[in-house]
């Protein structure tokens, strides 16, 4: 039987406010345990929550960016459950009336563009953190510690429709969402610090069946690689279970990266288990049109708009435009290079950034902001290819030297110091061709007999004689003339 995977994601995006969503405590990461939790966070008697305006504005900005409906009135609700790192005994979230409803997010899986519908985005507070490995009692018995620094940190939970059909598609969506929230400046995107965490709802069904299978939820995956592996494992587990005559249980599972498997955490609750009801300590969040308009006026150019502009203004393919707008820094870098080149050469800039620059950044695990070759310096290098000073092959060597800081990272200085200027004198190139032809009569005859590989062999020997500095285009043209 052929099976189809059905995936929906719930992403907890930590909003980049200086203080918590309902208290004035700092959200700074890495402070000593329990030093950033005040009376509200600790749920001390008499303390009352006060809504953080900055968190609401970031939610509005996200809603506008994805084309969702920003609710003029949304309500905070108490989500009731017991956990040691939840001092109040409930989490303040949103249930029936979220701050954002609907919206879409487009992204590429390989070179295929996909669009996923969003169900909602709602504001809520984070819980604290339980630490199980660092503590023990005097008797040596294991113990757990509670750090409430994270309790009350503002989150925007973004929920998709169950429309994704592969782990690769889910990861591509998550990457696109991560890029968007960082682009908007509403989240720092630091997955190691827990600023961007995904819950994956996974089920399987026979191909062609309309009804969904029983889903499981994989909690708090904070790596794109782990997200893909967790979904793949869980889908295989469910398929094998069903084919062996078993039944999938609705439950919450955790992904164990060391064993590359998911394991049961607890039975999956339904909404009624949490006994949601409006929080009596918080008034409804009322968002007037003037507030929405003010947020819209301050919006940056969105990735989708910039992609369309790159396609229209620079003639880039859709895939290239998408790759160059994964971050604002990358988009700005490309545009700075493209503007410094002659008209019609933007594709060459895109090729270099998506090729040599991206490969070197990945190898060194750096972001474009940390690239030692500036946009202006790269533009100078590409201009030397365009004006015939060096070949594309030599340019790669020059780029490596620029990256390493040779001659101050100046392309012209490196070309001069290494004597790399391309030979474009037709007389000098012609003389080299004559020497190679005279030394290789057998290869010449093979070419004249129709073997194209022979031509490539001759070109290679000419370039070797020129130490790679002959203009490749001129070599090809003059060689064809001499061979007749």
From Swiss-Prot:
EC number(s) from the headed UniProt entry: 6.3.5.-
Gene Ontology MF term list: asparaginyl-tRNA synthase (glutamine-hydrolyzing) activity; ATP binding; glutaminyl-tRNA synthase (glutamine-hydrolyzing) activity
Keywords: ATP-binding, Ligase, Nucleotide-binding, Protein biosynthesis
Matching InterPro entries: Asn/Gln-tRNA_amidoTrfase_suB/E (IPR017959), Asn/Gln-tRNA_Trfase_suB/E_cat (IPR006075), Asn/Gln_amidotransferase (IPR018027), Asn/Gln_tRNA_amidoTrase-B-like (IPR003789), GatB (IPR004413), GatB_C_1 (IPR042114), GatB_Yqey_C_2 (IPR023168), Gln-tRNA_amidoTrfase_suB_CS (IPR017958)
Catalytic activity: L-glutamyl-tRNA(Gln) + L-glutamine + ATP + H2O = L-glutaminyl-tRNA(Gln) + L-glutamate + ADP + phosphate + H(+); L-aspartyl-tRNA(Asn) + L-glutamine + ATP + H2O = L-asparaginyl-tRNA(Asn) + L-glutamate + ADP + phosphate + 2 H(+)
Biological process per Gene Ontology, one example term: translation
Enzymatic class: ligase
Pfam families noted in UniProt: GatB_N, GatB_Yqey
Keyword tRNA processing in annotation: no
Superkingdom field: Bacteria
Record flagged with keyword Nucleotide-binding: yes
Family label: Belongs to the GatB/GatE family. GatB subfamily.
Function: Allows the formation of correctly charged Asn-tRNA(Asn) or Gln-tRNA(Gln) through the transamidation of misacylated Asp-tRNA(Asn) or Glu-tRNA(Gln) in organisms which lack either or both of asparaginyl-tRNA or glutaminyl-tRNA synthetases. The reaction takes place in the presence of glutamine and ATP through an activated phospho-Asp-tRNA(Asn) or phospho-Glu-tRNA(Gln).
Quaternary structure (record): Heterotrimer of A, B and C subunits.
Protein name, per record: Aspartyl/glutamyl-tRNA(Asn/Gln) amidotransferase subunit B
Native source organism of the sequence: Bordetella parapertussis (strain 12822 / ATCC BAA-587 / NCTC 13253)
């Amino acid at each position: 039987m052929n099976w189809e995977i059905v995936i929906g994601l719930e992403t907890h995006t930590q909003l980049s406010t200086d203080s918590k969503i309902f208290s004035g405590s700092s959200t700074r990461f890495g402070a000593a345990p329990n030093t950033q939790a005040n009376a509200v966070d600790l749920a001390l008697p008499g303390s009352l929550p006060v809504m953080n305006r900055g968190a609401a504005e970031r939610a509005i900005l996200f809603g506008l960016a994805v084309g969702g409906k920003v609710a003029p009135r949304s309500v905070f609700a108490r989500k009731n459950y017991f956990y040691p790192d939840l001092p109040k005994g409930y989490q303040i979230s949103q249930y029936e009336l979220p701050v954002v409803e609907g919206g879409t997010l487009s992204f590429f899986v390989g070179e295929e563009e996909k669009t996923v519908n969003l169900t909602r985005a709602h504001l809520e507070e984070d819980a604290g953190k339980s630490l199980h490995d660092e503590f023990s009692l005097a008797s040596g018995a294991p113990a757990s510690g509670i750090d409430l620094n994270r309790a009350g940190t503002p989150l925007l939970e973004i929920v998709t429709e169950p429309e994704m059909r592969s782990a690769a598609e889910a990861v591509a969506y998550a990457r696109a969402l991560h890029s968007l929230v960082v682009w908007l400046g509403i989240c720092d995107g630091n997955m190691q610090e827990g600023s961007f965490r995904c819950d994956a709802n996974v089920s399987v069904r026979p191909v062609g069946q309309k009804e969904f299978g029983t889903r499981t939820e994989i909690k708090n995956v904070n790596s794109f690689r782990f997200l893909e592996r967790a979904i793949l494992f869980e889908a295989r587990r469910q398929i094998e279970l069903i084919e062996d005559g078993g039944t999938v249980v609705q439950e919450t599972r955790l992904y164990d990266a060391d064993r590359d498997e998911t394991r049961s955490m607890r039975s999956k609750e339904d909404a009624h288990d949490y006994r949601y009801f409006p929080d009596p300590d918080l008034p409804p969040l009322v968002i007037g049109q003037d507030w929405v308009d003010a947020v819209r006026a301050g919006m940056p150019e969105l990735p989708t708009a910039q992609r369309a502009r790159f396609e229209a203004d620079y003639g880039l393919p859709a895939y290239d435009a998408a790759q160059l707008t994964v971050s604002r820094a990358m988009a700005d870098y490309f545009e700075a290079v493209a503007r410094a080149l002659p008209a019609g050469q933007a594709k060459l800039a895109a090729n270099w950034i998506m090729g040599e620059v991206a490969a070197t950044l990945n190898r060194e695990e750096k972001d474009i902001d940390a690239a030692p070759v500036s946009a202006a310096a790269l533009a100078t290098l590409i201009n030397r290819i365009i004006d015939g000073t060096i070949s594309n092959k030599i340019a790669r060597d020059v780029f490596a030297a620029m990256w390493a800081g040779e001659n101050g990272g100046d392309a012209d200085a490196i070309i001069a110091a290494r004597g790399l200027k391309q030979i474009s004198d037709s007389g000098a190139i012609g003389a080299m061709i004559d020497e190679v032809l005279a030394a290789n009569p057998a290869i010449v005859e093979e070419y004249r007999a129709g073997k194209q590989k022979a031509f490539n062999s001759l070109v290679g020997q000419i370039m070797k004689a020129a130490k790679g500095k002959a203009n490749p285009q001129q070599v090809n043209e003059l060689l064809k003339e001499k061979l007749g």
